[in-house]
């Protein structure tokens, strides 16, 4: 899972891209980068670390231009090295090009092997580089046609921004697995970003979502853009965006992430009634669902677990050893609130079980008498291959254990999940979603 942003025909584009990336830091913490186009020349700065670690005022001042694309990296393909930061910039027959990508290509190894057999030399471990090579090795006269031809050869989930010396292309796969939205900046320029929370920070107005299978073409110096439906749309936005990844203040496909998460809590409360003194969220991602649960159940809401906000997300850390330590560093329950109490604990998901087990242990040590664990999504039973880092069945506790076995493992007094139908009800039944982590329907093959 990554964040991408494009700033088109706007003064100080790099600085605007920087702020947009900062607002989407939750989507990737391993690396960050920005490419700008100035007078037909593309310059790129990128590196490992948070947005604020990679960029400073001096760097941003050097990135001059009114066209920019940017990226926050969360590794799903490749390793966490400086080489694998995006954007990827290259020179080819039609000039300079830079590209950023959010998603995952399921046929990346097959495509890479074919390209290497044909003489291609790869500089990174990223599947994104496949697209650069496919574009460069095509002989069509126009970049637009080369991009479309390249996308015909890849399979997977992707949102792409491709920058040339004179144009920027925004593309979303036919399923629209990953979100991508279009907005208008105050100076008349455009912004394209993974989440609408970026629009709020930079003062942009939301226009619409980039449609599944759509390519939007922006030209340097022109106020209008061109919309092309390059693939037949088969919409299936990823349900996990609503459950966990997106910021609660974002809107995806017309749905407020915050309101969807509250609805998940309400549905949970209706299906799993239990007597308790408090409803306690696992912060921060469990808070909206806990509010919904408390509202529906009439059980008081308590922020009885304090989160250290200077510790990153446990789910997207590369090593299990680091995750174990970070749970303790990140969460601290309040004994003064919890001692002798029966509580309902709400979390957005159980992936590996690491965090849930630690949370229950911490709550027991804080004096909680009964712990009823409620999860605002179904059991994660299948690896997600479209941009979320769950590469094997072995890492998914619900792939190997029943609900009762998971309950026993994490040490809770009771455990309930939303069903798939209840998840659909919470988001809205009017469209299809990517539910591959829950139902194993790998619709991109």
Each PLM stretch: what is its role?
Residues 298-344, 354, 381-391:
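Short, glycine/charge-rich flexible loops or terminal/linker lids adjacent to PRPP-binding catalytic cores
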């Amino acid at each position: 899972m990554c964040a991408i942003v494009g700033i088109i025909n706007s003064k100080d584009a790099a600085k605007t891209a920087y702020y947009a990336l900062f607002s989407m830091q939750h989507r990737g913490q391993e690396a960050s980068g920005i490419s700008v186009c100035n007078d037909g020349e593309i310059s790129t700065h990128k590196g490992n670390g948070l947005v604020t670690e990679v960029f400073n005022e001096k760097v941003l001042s050097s990135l001059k231009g009114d066209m920019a694309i940017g990226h926050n990296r969360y590794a799903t393909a490749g390793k966490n090295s400086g080489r694998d930061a995006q954007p990827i910039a290259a020179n080819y027959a039609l000039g300079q090009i830079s590209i950023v990508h959010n998603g995952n290509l399921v046929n990346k190894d097959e495509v890479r092997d074919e390209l290497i057999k044909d003489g291609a030399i790869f500089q990174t471990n990223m599947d994104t580089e496949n697209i650069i090579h496919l574009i460069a090795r095509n002989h069509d006269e126009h970049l637009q046609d080369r991009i479309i031809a390249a996308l015909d050869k890849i399979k997977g989930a992707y949102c792409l921004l491709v920058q040339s010396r004179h144009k920027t292309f925004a593309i979303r796969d036919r399923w629209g697995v990953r979100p991508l939205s279009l907005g208008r900046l105050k100076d008349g320029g455009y912004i394209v970003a993974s989440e609408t929370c970026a629009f709020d920070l930079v003062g942009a107005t939301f226009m619409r979502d980039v449609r599944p299978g759509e390519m939007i073409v922006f030209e340097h110096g022109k106020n209008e853009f061109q919309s092309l439906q390059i693939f037949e749309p088969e919409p299936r936005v990823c349900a996990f965006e609503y459950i966990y990844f997106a910021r609660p203040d974002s809107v995806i496909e017309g749905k407020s992430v915050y309101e969807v998460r509250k609805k998940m809590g309400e549905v949970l409360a209706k299906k799993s009634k239990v007597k308790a003194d408090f409803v306690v969220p696992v912060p921060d991602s469990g808070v909206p669902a806990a509010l919904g649960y408390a509202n529906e159940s009439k059980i008081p809401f308590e922020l009885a677990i304090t989160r250290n906000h200077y510790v990153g997300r446990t789910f997207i850390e590369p090593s299990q050893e680091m995750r174990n330590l970070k749970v303790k560093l990140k969460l601290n329950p309040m004994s003064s609130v919890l001692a002798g109490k029966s509580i309902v604990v709400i979390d957005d998901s159980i992936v590996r079980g690491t965090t849930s087990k630690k949370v229950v242990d911490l709550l027991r040590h804080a004096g909680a008498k009964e712990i009823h664990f409620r999860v605002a999504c179904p059991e994660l039973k299948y690896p997600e291959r479209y941009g979320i880092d769950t590469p094997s069945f072995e890492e998914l506790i619900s792939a190997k254990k029943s609900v009762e076995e998971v309950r026993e493992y994490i040490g809770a007094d009771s455990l309930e999940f939303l069903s798939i139908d209840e998840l659909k009800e919470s988001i809205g039944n009017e469209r299809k979603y990517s539910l591959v982590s829950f139902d194993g329907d790998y619709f991109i093959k």
